[in-house]
Amino acid sequence: MAFAKAQKTKAYFKRYQVKFKRRREGKTDYRARIRLINQDKNKYNTPKYRFVVRTSNKDITAQIISASIAGDLVLASAYSHELPQYGLEVGLTNYAAAYCTGLLLARRVLKMLEMDAEYEGNVEATGEDYSVEPADTRRPFRALLDVGLIRTTTGNRVFGALKGALDGGLDIPHSDKRFAGYAKNGQQLDVEVHRKYIFGGHVAAYMRTLMEDEPEKYQSHFSEYIKKGIEADELEGLYKKVHAAIRANPIAKKSDKPQPKAHKRYNLKKLTYDERKARLVERLNALNSAADGDDDDDEDDE
C-alpha cells in the first residue's frame, strides 16, 4: 500500500481543540493534578491540601497548597534559602537541605494551626520510616505529595523533603521505597544509609575523597565550606543544630528590605468615569458662576 499523507481539512481545523496553556508549555501534568485536587463531593468546601516540592539550581521550595476555582491558595511555604537563619549557610540544594526544608515547613504550618505541641513528630532523625499517630483531640494535618514533572527515582531530593515533613509531624501518605538507602534487591530500607543522607554523610564522604585524590578540585568544589571553616567531620553536628533551631522557632522572619519608593509620574493619570463626570460638573459650575458674575457687572453699569 502506497504511503498517503494525512490531509488536514477544513473540518479538522474547525474541530481542533487547543490544549491548556500550561500543558502546551510543558509545566503541568493535568492527569496527575486532577487526581490530586478532586475532593469528595460529601466534603463540600473542605480544602484538599498538597505538599508541593520544587527544586532549582540554587533553591528548594516546599509549600502547602489547596486548589480553588479562583486559583491555588498557598497556606504556608518554606525555602532552603531561609536555612542560613538557622545556621546552615552552605549546601542549600542537597538531600540534607531538602530534609531541613521539609522539616521547616511542617513545623511552621503546625505552629500556624496551633498543633505543634500535639504533634512533635520524630524528634530524633534515625532514618527509619515514620508515620504520625492521631491524637485524642485533633486529627493530624493531612496533605498529598505533589512532585510535579520530576522522575520519581530512589533518593531524589523531593523525598528528602517528604521525610523532613513526616518527621516534622505532617500526615502524608507515602512508601519508603523512594527514600535514599532503599535496596531494590533486599526490598527494604537501609536505615543507616538513609540516616547518613539526612545528616549530609554523603557530602562528607565526597569531601574526604577529594581531599585525598584531587586536592585542587576540593579547593574549588568546596570553596564555600572552606571559607566558612566547615570540615567533613563537623557536618553531622551542624545538621543536628539546624534541626533543633528549626524546631525552636519555625516562624518566618520578615524581610529587612525597605519599601520601594514611589516613582514620580510624568504622564497624566487616566481618570475613571466617575472622576471625569465630577470634573465636568465642576467646570460647568465654574462657567455658570462666571456667567452670573458678568450679568451682575452689566446691571451695575446700567
Curated annotation (Swiss-Prot):
Quaternary structure (record): Component of the large ribosomal subunit (LSU).
The protein, known as: Large ribosomal subunit protein uL18
UniProt-listed HAMAP family: Ribosomal_uL18_A (MF_01337_A)
Single Gene Ontology BP annotation: translation
InterPro entries from the UniProt entry: Rbsml_uL18_euk, Ribosomal_uL18_C_euk
Subcellular location: Cytoplasm; Nucleus
Similarity annotation: Belongs to the universal ribosomal protein uL18 family.
Gene expressing this chain: RPL5
